[in-house]
Swiss-Prot record:
Name the record gives this protein: U3 small nucleolar RNA-associated protein 25
Biased composition (Basic and acidic residues): 18-34
One of the Pfam families matching this protein, by short name: UTP25_NTPase-like
Main location: nucleus
GO biological process, one term: maturation of SSU-rRNA from tricistronic rRNA transcript (SSU-rRNA, 5.8S rRNA, LSU-rRNA)
InterPro entries in the cross-refs: P-loop_NTPase, UTP25, UTP25_C, UTP25_NTPase-like
SUPFAM superfamilies: P-loop containing nucleoside triphosphate hydrolases
UniProt subcellular location: Nucleus, Nucleolus
Region (Disordered): 1-166
Length: 715
């Protein structure tokens, strides 16, 4: 499993740490990457540019060679023959062309076994100008076939939101975004909470919508409706409450994603994305047919600056495979170009040794867990093309790191972001997993959405929608964030980068509390200590002061020269790596911890150092173990020898709390003593969201506001 570390730009920059000359400290300062981590070369990170300004969706393609390619020669011959053949033979030409492409594909594979797919990809990934010609040909073919779908309904959210918005109302809402937004709250079934935020235009709005129970309640294209009736006949609860906002083009952050409902949510947003791009394409095709009939003076506004309309941000390549599989269920194309190569480079089998890992871990890291990728998908009426150039793609799927390296080089020079100028639907799936990579990449991508393009890229500005030309595209873009839990970082992204003037929806859960489900056979003493903190900026210093003056002193005071200590078997769980470094340095240099032996392991520790530290801790040679949240996220170790848990801060993921507290029950012989010493966790008022998931929604309020004391104990 490739662990996401600084070598790929996920964490803090790799620096040489000062080595502590003491036998009590492990050699952890080298900060080597975890086992299996691959260092991405500069060439692999910066291959995004193609020719003049085309952006490639492949992260290992070579420069395209337009000369001496048999396939290009074939294309020239076909184009020459097409010039001499009339429109009546259009379909026959296309069939002939497909036949020759198939023959060329087979010939390429035979000529170059093992590299056939890569060589073919070089031929198929044509440049932007060539794609334009191909797209025009496909549009003509679509026109000849005619539209198979019914007329657009006036109640269709796509028509109301994008195609025919009320210009006066739209201007009024955009103007109101600079002022205070109104908020309304309601309670939903299954313990969910609903919050709606919308621009204050002088009148109160009720954004609560009735639940949708099946695709029959949606305005889908006929082709998608038929597939949805087979693969997604019903929306499961609580997805019925999510559906009206997802398909209604509201911005939404959904904090109830689980391993149980993730697949259904994925099917829903893939169906929505496909419906959007097909309606966009069909509208262009219909208007193309109007121009010859009604004259060139007719004003048609049906396009953006560039073709890509949907951006899906995902944590791993295997997550990308799952999304593509979902798309393929609903869009059953006759031909899928480069699908074989996609599966070979994006999908791998699960690790059979992970049977004891938790379900959420297997979902995230199962298969290919590489977080450096990007992929363009191009849709025509009968074909889906993988690894299409971004400017020819309809949907872009990427990891935050993969997409950022397509925008910006390592030296900070921006090379390309025009392909993001016309994104109308952006989906962030498994956002809580992205927090453990590098959240700065996500914010960087959002800051480059819907900007005015630097170049024309063949755009027909006479057909660009007015709200694109006015620089208002971000106010109509739909942003969907799906996460297992909501954090301040996710809230900040939604507040500062989701601008939908039709409304923003937040749906999150109420929590019974992870303290009720600790996997230890006897009751565990769980103590929460609150400390005062004036601001988030000052919180790290206040936490450190409280820890060293109160918690650590109680651990060290019973230490005796005989070598026995009540602090033995103490695991200190530290959420932040910066805090980890600070605590490690204090343990190594402070007189308060002179007689405390300790080990320290983090996401940057080598496998050898991790194994040695765990062994010393289990055998009692180390009294204290420092352990980071990010290391636990990537490895899910089961640490033996734990008799007491001290949490420097409560974890974001409530599953982590249960797993860390569960270390107390690993040794059956010592479980009674360990349960009595139990867990002690520090928190401040800035930890409200985390504390709610750990202690429970009802308990959190009193723990934050209680004036009679700052210590709360549960068993």
């Amino acid at each position: 499993m490739a662990v996401k570390g600084a070598a790929k730009g996920r964490g803090p920059p790799r620096r040489k740490q000062p080595r502590f000359e003491t036998s009590r400290v492990q050699d952890l300062d080298d900060r080597e990457p975890l086992n299996g981590e691959q260092v991405v070369s500069e060439d692999a990170l910066n291959e995004a540019s193609d020719a003049e300004y085309s952006v490639s969706s492949s992260d290992n393609e070579e420069e395209e060679k337009s000369t001496d390619k048999p396939y290009n020669v074939l294309l020239q011959l076909l184009n020459a023959s097409e010039d001499s053949i009339g429109p009546a033979k259009k379909k026959r030409k296309l069939k002939h062309k497909e036949k020759n492409v198939k023959q060329q594909t087979e010939a390429t594979k035979e000529a170059s076994p093992g590299k056939g797919d890569l060589d073919l990809q070089d031929d198929l990934d044509v440049k932007e100008a060539e794609n334009t010609e191909s797209d025009n040909e496909q549009v003509e073919n679509d026109e000849a076939e005619g539209s198979e779908d019914e007329a657009d309904s006036g109640s269709d959210p796509f028509e109301i939101h994008f195609s025919q918005p009320d210009e006066a109302q739209l201007s009024k809402r955009i103007e109101a975004t600079s002022q205070k937004w109104r908020t309304s709250r309601q309670t939903l079934p299954a313990g969910m909470r609903f919050t709606a935020v919308y621009p204050d235009v002088g009148e109160e709005q009720n954004l609560h919508r009735a639940s949708l129970h099946s695709p029959k309640d949606l305005t889908l294209k006929r082709k998608l409706s038929e597939a949805a009736s087979v693969h997604l006949p019903q929306f499961d609860a609580p997805n019925t409450s999510v559906a009206p906002y997802l398909f209604g083009y509201y911005d939404m952050i959904y904090g109830g994603r689980t391993t149980g409902n993730a697949a259904k949510l994925r099917d829903m947003y893939c169906l929505h994305a496909l419906n959007h791009i097909i309606k966009t394409r069909d509208r262009v095709i219909k208007n193309n047919a109007r121009v010859p009939k009604e004259g060139e003076d007719i004003e048609i506004r049906d396009q953006g600056f560039t073709r890509p309309k949907v951006l899906i941000i995902l944590p791993t390549r295997q997550a990308c495979v799952r999304v593509v599989d979902s798309i393929s269920k609903f869009y059953q194309a006759e031909q899928q170009e480069n699908r074989k190569r996609f599966m070979e480079t994006f999908s791998t089998a699960d690790d059979d040794t992970w049977e004891d890992k938790t379900e959420d871990f297997r979902e995230l890291f199962g298969g290919n867990d590489d977080d450096m990728f990007r992929l363009g998908l191009k849709f025509t009426r009968k074909t889906v093309k993988f690894f299409s150039q971004f400017y020819s793609s309809d949907i872009i799927l990427a990891s935050p790191l993969g997409l950022r390296t397509a925008i910006e080089k390592e030296d900070g020079k921006k090379i390309e972001y025009d392909f993001l100028s016309s994104i109308e639907l952006v989906i962030v799936d498994h956002a809580d997993a992205l927090l453990m990579q590098n959240w700065d990449h996500v914010e960087y991508i959002f800051s480059h959405l819907n900007l005015q393009p630097k170049e024309a890229h063949g755009c027909d500005f006479g057909r660009v929608r007015t709200w694109y030309l006015d620089g208002n595209a971000k106010y109509l873009r739909q942003t969907l964030i799906l996460t297992s839990f909501i954090t301040p970082e996710i809230n900040s992204l939604f507040s500062h980068h989701a601008y939908n003037v039709f409304g923003k929806i937040k749906i999150d859960s109420t929590y019974p509390g992870a303290i009720l489900d600790v996997p230890v056979p006897v009751p565990v003493r769980q103590t929460f200590s609150r400390f005062d903190s004036l601001s988030p900026v000052k919180d790290p210093d206040a936490r450190f002061k409280y820890f060293t003056s109160t918690v650590l002193s109680s651990l060290a005071k019973n230490w005796s020269s005989s070598g026995k200590s009540s602090a033995a078997g103490t695991l200190i769980f530290i959420p932040s790596y910066l805090d980890f470094v600070r605590i490690r340095n204090y343990f190594a240099t402070s007189s308060q911890t002179t007689n405390l032996s300790f080990g320290a392991i983090s996401e940057y520790s080598s496998p050898r150092d991790v194994a040695r530290a765990r062994s010393h801790f289990m055998n009692g040679r180390h009294t204290v173990m420092l352990y980071t949240e990010r290391l636990h996220h990537f490895r899910r170790y089961k640490i033996r020898g734990v008799k007491r848990v001290v949490m420097y801060g409560v974890p974001e993921n409530p599953v982590f709390y249960k797993e860390i507290a569960g270390f107390l029950g690993i040794d059956p012989a010592a479980v009674g003593e360990a349960a009595e010493k139990g867990v002690r966790a520090l928190f401040s008022k800035w930890d409200a969201l985390k504390l709610e998931r750990i202690a429970g929604t009802k308990r959190m309020g009193s723990m934050m506001l209680e004036k009679g004391g700052d210590t709360f104990t549960f068993t």
